[in-house]
Amino acid sequence: MDKNEIILMLKNVSTSPGVYLWKDAKQNVLYVGKAKNLRKRMLQYFDGAINSYKTNKLVSLIYDFDVYICKTNKEALLLEKAMIDRYNPEFNILLLDDRKYPYLKVQLLKDSLLINLSRKVNAKDSKNTFYYGPFPSGYGAKPILKLLQHETLYENGLLIKNKDYNFWINQFNKIKEILSFKNNNYINELTNKMHQAANNMQFELALFLRDGLTYLKKLKESQIIELSQYKNIDVFAYKTDEKLIFATVLFYRYGILINKVNLTIPLGLSVDESLRVFFEQFYEDKILPDNLIVQEELLNFDLNLSSEYKFISPKIGTNKKVLDLAILNLNDYYEKEHLVIKNQLDKASNMLDSLNKYLNLPKLKNIVVFDNSNINNINPVGVAIVYTNGIKNKSLYRKFNLEALNERSADVEYIKQSISKFFSSNKNTKDYDLVIADGGIQQVNEAKKTLKTLNINIPVIGLVKNEFHKTKALIDLDMNEIHINDLELYNYLVQIQVEVDRFAKSHFRNRQKISSLEGKLRNIKGLGPNMEQNLLNHFKSYAKIYDASVEELSKIVPLNIAKSIKNKDYE
């Protein structure tokens, strides 16, 4: 269809909310979008209302479209996400930042409290669940977690038991008061406890309390009293470059600046569309704040977000001061990073061009790399890592537990298992442009055979290591072993091989830990199913139980059992 035919058809599209798919002449999905009014939004692509350097390219490729009408904006959001996951379209953006920040999670139970750290936030949790965060990674969260556990779950060093529900409601509210600093005497009380412990020569306890105090005081010092009545306020500032959006987010909790995040967002079809996708992805695993303080120009965008987003753009007062602070931090981040990040993106693009000189493929957007790890064929694992536009795409990384084999060719068979598992659970196979097998000709052959069995047509190459386990050469599409003379490309391929090896070994170590504990913990005298479940509820996995210290374990189980776990008395 030509442009005029498409516009004519669009005039008959529903004005309901929904999801639209732009397609090219081969019916490949180019872009997936969401709209409150499908007809209005889709026509904007052809009247110049959506203006960026990428829009013209997209419009030139559009040959057809599909629409899915939805009852609500929320239903459209879920469908859009599913469609993007399914088709991985060329013009949809993916956040470069994949960090997940820990929240302190407090749950009120009938006969206790459950206090832990969680990187997942469930907005549907009941009023008996309280989140506080997000904390900066590796900073502050654990000392405060341990302090709150000590202050609310223990008395005189012993776990509190046999208390009624009202007692635990009070402990639950006590934590809220501590973290909001509504109880101004608490820090003084804690300081007195620390001095008393030191006077009683309980130096370990005194140091423990001192660590918790240090972090609480840092939080208190950053509190803005005028904002203290608000549980959650986030401040968002941004500026655009040619291909990128740079952003700074400040997180205020009860007026306390608890975290700052700097981000680089790929600029998609337009600034408003890119920001809309950013907000939906960014707050997918975070608490949506009571208010989002933003620059005035952001209010003029049609972001097509749910009514749960409360944007305000202050001109005076305390809110304007924190917005100015976010802009100040943003400018500092931009000056330091914009050239560095732009160079990284350009370099990744250049590396793909250099690699493609050896392959001559139509495009190299998504590359998937396979590797496995095992020792003597015990607990073998496989992994797949994905590079999108030359950059690690950790949201698409996958790991697999493989079936152990004893024959000499097991290493080759493990590649087969990994590829089968990856593509059997992956509907958008046609969106992968290249498979890289970590290995030589045997591994590449096995990868090709496996893909053929699965009726998947994707080119395969290999990365060969030498006897010192260093990258040696590339197995090209014609099964030739080629030594890479381009030093930059060689180093780039080395980085890919190091990354897939790291991911495989990390998964293997975790599987070893799990196999060491799973099904064996109850071999320890006095450790029954309830105690095992309590450990799993707290630590979330056998691997984390394996890594826990005696001190951490003894907060959940008796000290003698904690020592038995650490001494591996279950073996």
From Swiss-Prot:
Residues annotated as domain UVR: 184-219
CDD domains named among the record's database cross-references: GIY-YIG_UvrC_Cho
UniProt key word DNA damage: yes
PROSITE patterns: GIY_YIG (PS50164), UVR (PS50151), UVRC (PS50165)
Domain of life: Bacteria
One GO CC term on file: excinuclease repair complex
Domain GIY-YIG: start-end pairs: 15-93
GO BP of this protein: nucleotide-excision repair; SOS response
Keyword Membrane among record annotations: no
PANTHER family xref list: UVRABC SYSTEM PROTEIN C, UVRC/OXIDOREDUCTASE
Protein name per its UniProtKB record: UvrABC system protein C
Designated gene of the protein: uvrC
